[in-house]
């Protein structure tokens, strides 16, 4: 679990997301409250439930990007799902309980990686011994079993020194490695994914753990042996317990496009992919127990963050019970031309930085001037105003159009420097931006 303070979390989000300070503050406080709760005594800790968040804002302003960055910062089980993929229980499609199952699977992977990393030093020693056994086979007794020696031989110590110094990295050896489990692909109808994964696990375990001889360079064999030995040191039962504990105490679920499951006014009959999904989400958000293949998982202290554009529907169109379980509302603002300028220059991996790096691979150096950046931002904002407002995603469309000729001819332009200024942008984009019909279909 992350121990970052809210200020540190916001500072980290600022490196990738421009504006939207209220949303950043809310998720930062929610993340910090996870840590604060764990510092309480057990009796009070059980009573403190997470304050779920509803993020409201037009498309392309940073809702999903906040979720992506939060997943990296949280250091906790995290899953992002689309609300539109689920249907009410009993109908064809995924049921909402699969959210918790997927969250538990991601926790198992996360805890396994942490456990492997914790045991890496010991695993490296064991892998080293296995390689030395191949290079200098131990002496055997009359029954064909390796003799137990009090101290390693001088030759073994000499090879160990060479191995650690990398002198033997390119030497090829034949070594027995665990064979890949038998692959079984089972196609199941929607909603039956849990049964499918259990059947696959059963078939994979039928053959037992087999070993297969492989010829590899020592440096490649060492990597595989370390992974294999580290996996042996992981206790599967402890792994499940720790993963379930991590999900129950620190799990975060991000539900995107929640506005798409709001009930439409004049719809009659069963609304299985809208209001039905909301009703199924209620017990998860309120707190219930979900059965997974790893064990029972309680959702009482899982943090839920929902987001939606709410351009057609409004938050009040959600069923009242679900509204009550999303007490913190955060409104994200539409982006201005000034925001677009900052998006093009400030983030660590801004779109302009990406295009520069891509062209550098062909030996072409791209320079964006300040007035060029400003003109690109104005063009994107203008198209958003005159057609559909898709937020910062419009920058990708505009830049792709702007860079099309350079990208096409890059292999013939090696060693050249191309400056993208206001005149260059105007020459390539003004006609498209001015014509609303063209910009609607091209930009």
Swiss-Prot record:
Keywords: ATP-binding, Chaperone, Cytoplasm, Nucleotide-binding. One of its GO terms (cellular component) is HslUV protease complex. The keyword Nucleotide-binding applies. GO terms for biological process: protein unfolding; proteolysis involved in protein catabolic process. One of its GO terms (molecular function) is ATP binding. SUPFAM superfamilies: P-loop containing nucleoside triphosphate hydrolases. Gene3D superfamilies: 1.10.8.60, DNA helicase RuvA subunit, C-terminal domain, P-loop containing nucleotide triphosphate hydrolases. It is found in: Cytoplasm. Transmembrane segments: none annotated. ATP binds at residues 18, 60-65, 256, 321, 393. Its main location: cytoplasm. The keyword Nucleotide-binding applies. A double ring-shaped homohexamer of HslV is capped on each side by a ring-shaped HslU homohexamer. The assembly of the HslU/HslV complex is dependent on binding of ATP. PANTHER family: ATP-DEPENDENT CLP PROTEASE ATP-BINDING SUBUNIT CLPX-LIKE, MITOCHONDRIAL-RELATED (PTHR48102), ATP-DEPENDENT PROTEASE ATPASE SUBUNIT HSLU (PTHR48102:SF3). ATPase subunit of a proteasome-like degradation complex; this subunit has chaperone activity. The binding of ATP and its subsequent hydrolysis by HslU are essential for unfolding of protein substrates subsequently hydrolyzed by HslV. HslU recognizes the N-terminal part of its protein substrates and unfolds these before they are guided to HslV for hydrolysis. Belongs to the ClpX chaperone family. HslU subfamily. This is ATP-dependent protease ATPase subunit HslU. It comes from Cronobacter sakazakii (strain ATCC BAA-894). The gene is hslU.
């Amino acid at each position: 679990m992350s121990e970052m303070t809210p200020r540190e979390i916001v500072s980290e989000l600022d490196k990738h997301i421009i504006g939207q300070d209220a949303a950043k503050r809310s998720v930062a406080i929610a993340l910090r409250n996870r840590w604060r709760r764990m510092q309480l005594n057990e009796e009070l800790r059980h009573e403190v439930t997470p304050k779920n968040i509803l993020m409201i804002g037009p498309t392309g302003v940073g809702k999903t990007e906040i979720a992506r960055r939060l997943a990296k910062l949280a250091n906790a089980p995290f899953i992002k799902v689309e609300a539109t993929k689920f249907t009410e229980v009993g109908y064809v499609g995924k049921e909402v309980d699969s959210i918790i199952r997927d969250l538990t699977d991601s926790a198992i992977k996360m805890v396994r990686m942490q456990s492997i990393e914790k045991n890496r030093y010991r695993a490296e020693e064991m892998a080293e011994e296995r390689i030395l056994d191949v290079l200098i086979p131990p002496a055997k007794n009359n029954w064909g079993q390796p003799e137990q020696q009090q101290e390693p031989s001088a030759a073994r110590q000499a090879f160990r020194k060479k191995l650690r110094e990398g002198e033997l990295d390119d030497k090829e050896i034949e070594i027995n490695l665990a064979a890949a489990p038998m692959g079984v692909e089972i196609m199941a109808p929607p909603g039956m994914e849990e049964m499918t994964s259990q059947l696959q696990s059963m078939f994979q375990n039928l053959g037992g753990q087999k070993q297969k001889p492989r010829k590899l360079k020592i440096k490649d064999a060492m990597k595989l042996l370390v992974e294999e030995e580290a996996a042996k040191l992981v206790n599967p039962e402890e792994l499940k317990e720790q993963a379930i504990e991590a999900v129950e105490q620190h799990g975060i679920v991000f539900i995107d496009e929640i506005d798409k499951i709001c009930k439409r006014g004049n719809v009659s009959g069963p609304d299985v992919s809208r209001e039905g999904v909301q009703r199924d989400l209620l017990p998860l958000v309120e707190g219930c127990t979900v059965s997974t293949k790893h064990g029972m998982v309680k959702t009482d202290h899982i943090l839920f963050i929902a987001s939606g554009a709410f351009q057609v529907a409004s938050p009040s169109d959600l069923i009242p019970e679900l509204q009550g379980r999303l007490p913190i509302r955060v409104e994200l603002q539409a982006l201005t031309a000034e925001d677009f300028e900052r998006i093009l220059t400030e983030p660590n991996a801004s779109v302009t930085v990406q295009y520069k790096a891509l062209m550098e691979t062909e030996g072409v150096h791209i320079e964006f001037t300040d007035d060029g950046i400003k003109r690109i931002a104005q063009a994107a904002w203008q198209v958003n105003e005159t057609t559909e407002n898709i937020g910062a995603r419009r920058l990708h469309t505009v830049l792709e159009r702007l860079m099309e000729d350079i990208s096409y001819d890059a292999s013939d332009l090696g060693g050249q420097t191309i400056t993208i200024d206001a005149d260059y942008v105007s020459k390539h984009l003004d006609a498209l931006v001015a014509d609303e019909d063209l910009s609607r279909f091209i930009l």
